[in-house]
């Protein structure tokens, strides 16, 4: 009998996951178009991709796209709460080694990543990394440096992971070429902005059933994620206060009509708090002590360092688990704090993450990055690179038909006047969308 080469919560959920996966495919035109374009040429043949990214239904479509293009794939989730167990089961049932389930411990999380390094069907180790947050990249560099010699490249999904890549490269610790997928326009301006715009409120409402209209919401950070969250909360009728360290982002927030102040001032008024910064220690003990009764506190940044959950656990008189990922802490001053997803990603811990369509944009970039690194590694020396503007525009183009968009075509006269090709790229690399 063959050895079981996966660990998921319940493999019997595979049929349920497959049904949702089929619905998601219809909402992910970019990935399906890439399959159709490259299925015959098999550009990822020989690639052994270890992926560490939220094991959701949308990620399942990404995994099956990589396999359709010739890759061997193993998978773990980049967050202990973000796995959708029916999605993990659906992929494991196809023979892809998946090590992920919702509610892993920290030890189990690292175990899952370790397992995927040596679980490829061919018996050979990984030679490509597809990462979200940088944990897989860091683990291979720190614990398994002997594997780095055969790894052709890394593609990184999120802001936090990209920050770590640039830091590693600056400190001469990065040993493999990497592509920054996060800062592709069709990722950052869509996934980070429009995705958070829908999934943040979904997570808060599923967790608490709270009425957002009329509340005061505090959003820490006004980058693309913060912009999406602030706009979303305002659209629900909340009065939104923004905190920022960057004067440019602060000015943007103010001119968008948001009040901008410090967290020390905002805690006196806020009832819903959302951290979006990618930085640590944004909401600390002194802030909790000033919050109103039953303030809702959550994070939508990648790691769980933005909210000082350790202080909350150490200093609370009592804690009651209301339901999965919803805990009510009683402080020594008698007031209560409602913490969502233990300070981790609220949209994935308390809901199902971003909608399929916007994830198709992000994941199409991931596939193109993997193809570029695998087939053309001479164009990507050691460092952190961006995908060419032409590919960024192609990702957008693949999603227009689904929305019924009709694109205008430049005339030859207009093309000459602007000095750009009729078929693009249409903007310089330094253009800010």
From Swiss-Prot:
Which residues are involved in binding NAD(+)?
Answer: 158-160, 192, 221-226, 244, 300-302, 347
What this protein catalyses is:
S-adenosyl-L-homocysteine + H2O = L-homocysteine + adenosine
InterPro entries for this protein: Adenosylhomocyst_ase-like_sf, Adenosylhomocysteinase-like, Ado_hCys_hydrolase_NAD-bd, NAD(P)-bd_dom_sf, S-Ado-L-homoCys_hydrolase_CS
What SUPFAM superfamilies does its record include?
Formate/glycerate dehydrogenase catalytic domain-like (SSF52283), NAD(P)-binding Rossmann-fold domains (SSF51735)
Any one GO cellular component localisation term in the record: cytosol
Q: Which Gene3D superfamilies match?
A: Adenosylhomocysteinase-like, NAD(P)-binding Rossmann-like Domain
Binding note for cofactor = Binds 1 NAD(+) per subunit.
Per the entry, which co-factors are needed?
Answer: NAD(+)
Q: Which Pfam families match?
A: AdoHcyase, AdoHcyase_NAD
Give the residues the record marks as binding substrate.
56, 132, 157, 187, 191
Q: Which UniProt keywords apply?
A: Hydrolase, NAD, One-carbon metabolism
* Pathway(s) served: Amino-acid biosynthesis; L-homocysteine biosynthesis; L-homocysteine from S-adenosyl-L-homocysteine: step 1/1
Question: Biological process (GO) annotations?
Answer: methionine metabolic process; one-carbon metabolic process; S-adenosylmethionine cycle; selenocysteine metabolic process
Any idea what job this protein has? Adenosylhomocysteine is a competitive inhibitor of S-adenosyl-L-methionine-dependent methyl transferase reactions; therefore adenosylhomocysteinase may play a key role in the control of methylations via regulation of the intracellular concentration of adenosylhomocysteine.
Report what the protein is called.
Adenosylhomocysteinase
* Source species: Schizosaccharomyces pombe (strain 972 / ATCC 24843)
């Amino acid at each position: 009998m063959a050895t079981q080469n996966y660990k998921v919560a319940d493999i019997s959920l595979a049929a349920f996951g497959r049904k949702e996966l089929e619905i998601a495919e219809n909402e992910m035109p970019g990935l399906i178009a890439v399959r159709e374009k490259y299925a015959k040429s098999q550009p990822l043949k020989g690639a052994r991709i270890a992926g560490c990214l939220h094991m959701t239904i949308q990620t399942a479509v990404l995994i099956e796209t990589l396999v359709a293009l010739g890759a061997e794939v193993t998978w773990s989730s980049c967050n202990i709460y973000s796995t959708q167990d029916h999605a993990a089961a659906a992929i494991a049932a196809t023979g892809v080694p998946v090590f992920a389930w919702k509610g892993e411990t920290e030890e189990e999380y690292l175990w899952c990543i370790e397992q995927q390094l040596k679980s490829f069907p061919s018996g050979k180790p990984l030679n490509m990394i597809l990462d979200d947050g940088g944990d897989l990249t860091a683990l291979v560099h720190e614990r398994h440096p002997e594997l780095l010699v055969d790894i052709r490249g890394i593609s990184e999904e999120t802001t936090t992971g990209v920050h770590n890549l640039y830091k590693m490269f600056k400190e001469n610790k990065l040993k493999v070429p990497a592509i920054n997928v996060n800062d592709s326009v069709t990722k950052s301006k869509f996934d980070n902005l429009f995705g958070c715009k829908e999934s943040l409120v979904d997570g808060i409402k599923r967790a608490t059933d709270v009425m957002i209209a009329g509340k005061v919401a505090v959003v820490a950070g006004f980058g693309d994620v913060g912009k999406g969250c602030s706009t979303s909360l305002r659209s629900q009728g909340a009065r939104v206060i923004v905190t920022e360290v960057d004067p440019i982002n602060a000015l943007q927030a103010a001119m968008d009509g948001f009040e901008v102040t410090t967290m020390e001032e905002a805690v006196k008024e806020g009832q819903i708090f959302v951290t979006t910064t990618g930085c640590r220690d944004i909401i600390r003990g002194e802030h909790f002590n000033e919050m109103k009764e039953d303030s809702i506190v959550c994070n939508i940044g990648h790691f769980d360092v933005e909210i000082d959950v350790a202080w909350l656990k150490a200093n609370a008189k009592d804690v009651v688990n209301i339901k999965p990922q919803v805990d009510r802490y009683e402080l020594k001053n008698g007031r209560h704090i409602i913490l969502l997803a233990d300070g981790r990603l609220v949209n994935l811990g308390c809901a199902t993450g971003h909608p399929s369509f916007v994830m198709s944009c992000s994941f199409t970039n991931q596939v193109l990055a993997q193809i570029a690194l695998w087939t053309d590694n001479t164009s990507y020396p050691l460092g952190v690179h961006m995908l060419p503007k032409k590919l960024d525009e192609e990702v957008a183009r693949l999603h227009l038909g689904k929305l019924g968009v009709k694109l205008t075509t430049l005339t030859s006269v207009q093309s000459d006047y602007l000095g750009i090709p009729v078929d693009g790229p249409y903007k310089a690399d330094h253009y800010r969308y």
